[in-house]
Amino acid sequence: MSKKLHIKTWGCQMNEYDSSKMADLLDEYEGYTLTDNAEEADVLLLNTCSIREKAQEKVFHQLGRWKTLKDKKPGLIIGVGGCVASQEGKAIKERAQCVDLIFGPQTLHRLPEMIDQIKDGKKAVIDVSFPEVEKFDRLPEPRAEGPSAFVSIMEGCSKYCSFCVVPYTRGEEVSRPLDDVILEIAQLAEQGVREVNLLGQNVNAYRGATHDDEICTFAELLRYVAAIDGIDRLRFTTSHPIEFTQDIIDVYEDTPELVSFLHLPVQSGSDLILTQMKRGHMAIEYKSIIRRLRKARPDILISSDFIIGFPGESKQDFADTMKLIEDIQFDHSFSFIYSARPGTPAADLPDNVSLDEKKERLAILQDRITQQAMRYSRQMVGTVQRILVEGPSVKNPMELRGRTENSRVVNFEGLHEHIGKFVDVEIVDVYTNSLRGVFIRGEDEMDLRRDLRPSDITAKYKQADDLGVTLFTPA
């Protein structure tokens, strides 16, 4: 009988990616198969997030429920990974004796050895070190699960925003070598993946080593990935404004595979609050990036993160944020009430904004952005949109579900053979969380590929001066 593995994942898309790699790793290691039922599992893994308030308490509440399972099944192995594990380390074991494994985001590749040690009688294994990109060298080959895939290209962040725990829980920025990234994406493309989302805590800070000991910039990487046969749609998340350089913007001008949608967190529209957050830029600099982006790609839509009620946020500061939202006309946002994260500089600032005021401001902000998003959706009615068909519709399995470049779900009537492919649909109706489309044409009627090699694309923009320094010039 096969061994069963249950993974509960909280947090960002990077955690989702890590959890999928854990599952692949343990399947290859000893044939563990995933189960949604924790009660039938032989190994329980909790992949945690420390961004939100009371993250630690949430972990211990879950472990309390799992302890009941272990009392009934003494051989059950329980592991805690992710950012809370990295932050708390052995304190987790001291408070929850049922835990066998504690591992950080950078050491998940050591899970097989950790499990072996527990089976050999060791009481607990704790490894929350930061061995840079070693984990990627030890993970099994990628497995596609549908036409879209996430690929991690870097780990950590070196920006040290005053409110953020990422540099402390995932380490500083470390980029994967270019060849490793390209190989993983090419393997996914061979399995039918058509859309790739490049992941990183600060993805546009990517600086990956090449085979000849040069450095590949993020803009170059985008061009390389866009040239991989079979990859016809390209996304990335999450970016930082101070790393959003002109060469990245230039890619939007001539690379149709790169979608007309960008998530670029700003957090606040107040220069005073941005300074307190140690974001490294002002609101006008953010607006300048968006202005240049829209010049390169006029139809691009922008989403952002916002923190509401940061210590010292006055009514004027919030008004500045709302003014920025009006100026940019964001399509979507991930917005949260500020909660202090232990160990961060902002945790020492006086939190002088009342909870009621925070809630009111959050509601105002979310209502405004929802209105803007609905306006964009209505503007799509009557247009023809290219969507990647992901599978049957959630509400009506007799229909199909696809996603537009700007991440809107479209339900339409179509043939099963379209799943995993691109189709063009006319948008005919708008709902709160989806659009309605009518099938226009299939992939066999489209011209999706350009007859270019990766080197042809990058050579157009790359040149070296007399000193051998690589330069990029706009198209």
UniProtKB/Swiss-Prot annotation:
HAMAP family recorded for this chain? tRNA_metthiotr_MiaB
Q: Where is the MTTase N-terminal domain?
A: 3-120
Listed GO MF terms: 4 iron, 4 sulfur cluster binding; metal ion binding; N6-isopentenyladenosine methylthiotransferase activity
Is Cytoplasm set as a keyword in this record? yes
Catalytically driven reaction(s): N(6)-dimethylallyladenosine(37) in tRNA + (sulfur carrier)-SH + AH2 + 2 S-adenosyl-L-methionine = 2-methylsulfanyl-N(6)-dimethylallyladenosine(37) in tRNA + (sulfur carrier)-H + 5'-deoxyadenosine + L-methionine + A + S-adenosyl-L-homocysteine + 2 H(+)
- Please give the subunit comment from the record: Monomer.
Q: What InterPro entries does its record include?
A: Elp3/MiaA/NifB-like_rSAM, Methylthiotransferase, Methylthiotransferase_CS, Methylthiotransferase_N, Methylthiotransferase_N_sf, MiaB_methiolase, rSAM, rSAM_horseshoe
**Location of this chain's protein in the cell:** Cytoplasm
Put simply, this protein is called tRNA-2-methylthio-N(6)-dimethylallyladenosine synthase
Q: Which cofactor does it need?
A: [4Fe-4S] cluster
Q: Which gene encodes it?
A: miaB
Top class in the EC scheme: transferase
UniProt EC number: 2.8.4.3
